[in-house]
Each structure stands twice: as structure tokens, then as C-alpha cells.
Regions:
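Core AdoMet radical
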Residues: 1-15, 19-84, 94-101, 124-127
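Catalytic cores of alpha/beta
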Residues: 41-50, 103-119, 183-195
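Conserved, mostly hydrophobic/aromatic
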Residues: 3, 58, 88, 118, ...
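Short, small-residue-enriched loops and turns at beta-alpha junctions
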Residues: 7-12, 74, 102-107, 133-135, ...
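Surface-exposed amphipathic alpha-helices with a cationic face
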Residues: 18-28, 49, 85-90, 163-170, ...
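Generic structural signal for well-ordered alpha-helices
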Residues: 17-22, 45, 82-85, 115, ...
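Aromatic-anchored, glycine/proline-accented short structural segments
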Residues: 84-135
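Auxiliary Fe-S-binding modules of radical SAM enzymes
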Residues: 119-261
């Protein structure tokens, strides 16, 4: 199970997150718990691990300082993001990272730098996402909207290429096929599986709340319950000539090799 939220660091939010993790661990002791709660301090990350969390996804978005400064508020720090990733590794998490592909101003050299950062960081799992424009973000100027529409197929293909290159660089890591790929093509995630991804994530968020979590426009899978999403995911894997591994935690082989030799 993946639990994702914004960066909430006040005491009540921390207690809320801890209570959820403890409840899941108590009721479903065999379930793997992945968290994506943004940058958090090391003591809280330790508490979450002790409560029962196994994995933590913290995307770098871009390892290039120039782009990172452009995409984030002034009080955000690339150095702090990297420190948090190191903290997660030191606490024994399966550590996930990732980037956004196709950003305005991003070059091929920038994407190569990201891949080298992933390799050198020795991460266990990855969430790579294509840039999908959202009208309520600072990047969504009329000029950028037109730019994105003209280059959407290029962004999609570059995402598949990065997945394939990452699979070659890190053959035993877990790589998610991002839901956002289905914005570009109905079989976008299936194409990602063929390119080298090996993880699909069905949404179990109640449909009544999915419209409140629109990270990008044209987001698929806003209707339907968890059971329907699960069946859809199985069909996608089968159409990519893969057999889904159901009922297992799906621990990254890279993590097992890294921690057990």
C-alpha cells in the first residue's frame, strides 16, 4: 500500500500519519507500507519506520540545481532534499527516488545527470513521471501550454527512453509505470512496462475524493472503485505479456542485494 500526502510537518499531522501506519501494521501485518510524505525530519522518519513503514518515495524531480531552483519556492533546498534521501537510507528504508521528464528548459544532458544521480544514489525503486501541464501552476503560461501541446509525444517517448536506460543501469530496481503516461496514450502504462517498468499502482482512493487530488489535468482513473481499478491493472499487465505478482510485498531485488548481499 502506498500512502501519499503533502508535506505536513505539524504535530497533529505527524500523529495522524503514525496512527494510520500503526493501524495498517496491526490489521495487516504482512502488507508492505510505502510512504510518500515529502521531506520530513529524521526523528519522525525513524518513528514511521518503527511504526511499520517499509518504503519511502521522495522524488528529486530534477538533480540539476538550475532547474530545481526554478521549480521550487525560495525556501526549498536541493541539498536538504538529498540529505533526506540519505537519512531514509540510513534508517533502513527501501528508498525511492525519481524525476519529472519533459520539463520546460530541461535538456538531454539534464536527464543524463538525473540518471547518473540515480545510479550513484543506489536507490531501490523509482517513480519517473512525464511532465503534464496543469492550468493552476506557475508554469502554465499560454506560451508553455502551446509548447506542451506541440511536444507531448516527444515527452512521452523521452519518458519511455529514460525508463529503458534506467532499467539497463539498475537492472534489479523497481520502476513504476506512472499513471500520468495514460494521459498521452490509453496504453501508456503498458508501453512503460514493455520499456522496463515493473510496478503498477491501482488507486484505492474512494472515488468521491479523487477529484480533490488532481496533480495534473486529464488525469485518468477518476471514476470506479478500488476493485475495478485492480482488475484494470491486471489486464494492463497481461496485455504487456507480464504476469502480475499478487499477494506479495514486491520488495525491490536491489534492496535485498544491497542489504543481504
Amino acid at each position: 500500500m502506498v500512502l501519499q500526502a503533502g508535506v505536513l510537518s505539524f504535530p497533529d499531522a505527524k500523529e495522524y500519519f503514525l496512527a494510520i501506519v500503526r493501524s495498517i501494521r496491526e490489521r495487516f501485518p504482512e502488507m508492505g507500507i510505502t510512504l510518500s510524505l515529502g521531506e520530513q525530519d529524521q526523528p519522525f522518519l525513524r518513528e514511521l519506520k518503527e511504526a511499520g513503514a517499509h518504503r519511502y518515495l521522495l522524488r528529486i524531480e530534477t538533480s540539476v540545481p538550475r532547474l530545481y531552483r526554478r521549480l521550487h519556492p525560495a525556501n526549498h533546498s536541493l541539498a536538504r532534499r538529498k540529505k533526506c534521501l540519505r537519512d531514509l537510507r540510513g534508517l533502513g528504508y527501501q528508498v525511492g527516488c525519481g524525476n519529472m521528464i519533459g520539463l520546460p528548459g530541461q535538456t538531454l544532458d539534464d536527464m543524463v545527470d538525473d540518471l547518473l544521480f540515480f545510479r550513484d544514489g543506489d536507490f531501490d525503486m523509482f517513480g519517473l513521471g512525464p511532465y503534464v501541464i496543469h492550468r493552476d501552476t506557475p508554469l502554465a503560461t499560454p506560451r508553455t501550454v502551446a509548447w506542451w501541446e506541440e511536444r507531448r509525444e516527444e515527452i512521452f517517448q523521452r519518458t519511455l527512453n529514460v525508463i529503458a536506460l534506467l532499467r539497463i543501469l539498475m537492472p534489479t530496481c523497481n520502476i513504476a509505470a506512472a499513471t500520468a503516461l495514460d494521459v498521452f496514450h490509453k496504453d501508456g502504462r503498458e508501453q512503460a512496462l514493455r520499456a522496463g517498468a515493473n510496478v503498477l499502482m491501482p488507486s484505492v482512493t474512494p472515488s468521491a475524493y479523487r477529484h480533490a487530488y488532481l496533480l495534473y489535468q486529464r488525469k485518468p482513473c477518476l471514476d470506479g472503485d478500488a476493485e475495478r481499478c485492480g482488475r484494470c491493472i491486471v489486464r494492463k499487465a497481461e496485455r504487456a505479456n507480464l504476469r502480475p505478482a499478487l499477494g506479495v510485498q514486491g520488495t525491490s531485488l536491489h534492496f535485498l542485494h544491497r542489504t543481504h548481499g
